[in-house]
Amino acid sequence: MDQNKQKALAAALGQIEKQFGKGSIMRLGDSKTMDIEAISTGSLSLDVALGIGGLPCGRIVEIYGPESSGKTTLTLQVIAEAQKKGKVCAFIDAEHALDPIYAAKLGVNVDDLLISQPDTGEQALEICDMLVRSNAVDVIIVDSVAALTPKAEIEGEMGDSHVGLQARLMSQALRKLTANIKNANCLCIFINQIRMKIGVMFGSPETTTGGNALKFYASVRLDIRRIGAIKEGDEVVGNETRVKVVKNKVAPPFKQAEFQIFYGVGISKEGELVDLGVKHKLIDKAGAWYSYNGEKIGQGKANVMKLFTENKVMAAEVEARLRELLLSGDVPAEKPVVADADELEAESEQEFE
């Protein structure tokens, strides 16, 4: 760039900063804009799948899935992890269904958690906006979008038609919220439910409530599903859960994480440490025996999990090593699903020979 253009650009940038404030325009390579702070989800495998070690601050996140799939449990684990870092968290309970006893069991400090149970969708989103603009709240959960009932619908008759009212409400609210959330560096998580579209012949009939606005404004979208039951004898004690990163603006998307959620306990961190440790050769497995640093640590996965529960120092060491390995980008990439054109050509030639 020649000197005249550089001077003109510098003058324009100076004028913009003077008129609109410092930071209103900057170069993308500036370190302040590049680094994204993340809050752990409480699941190591999900943190790795998200690519940055957790959910991004200053962004909108959507978590959706069928009933009893673990949506609220996952958000409560995020609150517990955020509170460990000294962050202030708020829970906007539009469903009026939050159980404080269950939240406490998952590690949430219920004494410090801000909770609101609003009457209307407008009230819920206005409270959310005021909390964000205060710059004092770090994590806000809205549970759920489907329960954000517009005031007109509440005041109207039961059979009245209110086409697109909730979608318009969400669209307007997100236009206001997005910039404020970024400026406050606040993590805002919307929990959403699934509905079925009628008459869909091809593709998935599933859709989320509240229109399309949230799909666009969300930086991360997580699809959480229950894929199996965990049993002790005949008694079901938990769920096998799979989370798919459907959208990710801060790292490569479409990665998956699988973990166990035990009733009354939450996400099994110890089980993840064992599985990921074996997968990435930090823990050696010979038959039913597991070894760490050359020493046997237990026979059977359940015994190793019990050891990690009791020995917090060893568990923290294994987790730190796994995070360093998996989030540094040194893990060898898996072979892509789509084959090269040369490979496909070679295979077709072999078939014809």
UniProtKB/Swiss-Prot annotation:
Name the InterPro entries for this protein: AAA+_ATPase (IPR003593), DNA_recomb/repair_RecA (IPR013765), DNA_recomb/repair_RecA_CS (IPR020584), P-loop_NTPase (IPR027417), RecA-like_C (IPR049261), RecA-like_N (IPR049428), RecA_ATP-bd (IPR020588), RecA_C_sf (IPR023400)
> What does the entry list as the binding residues for ATP?
65-72
Which is a Gene Ontology cellular component entry for this protein?
cytosol
Entry's NCBIfam families? tigrfam_recA (TIGR02012)
Q: What does this protein do?
A: Can catalyze the hydrolysis of ATP in the presence of single-stranded DNA, the ATP-dependent uptake of single-stranded DNA by duplex DNA, and the ATP-dependent hybridization of homologous single-stranded DNAs. It interacts with LexA causing its activation and leading to its autocatalytic cleavage.
Q: What family classification does the UniProt entry report for this protein? A: Belongs to the RecA family.
This one is known as Protein RecA
Query: Origin organism of this chain?
Result: Aeromonas salmonicida (strain A449)
Organism placement in taxonomy:
Bacteria, Pseudomonadati, Pseudomonadota, Gammaproteobacteria, Aeromonadales
Protein encoded by which gene: recA
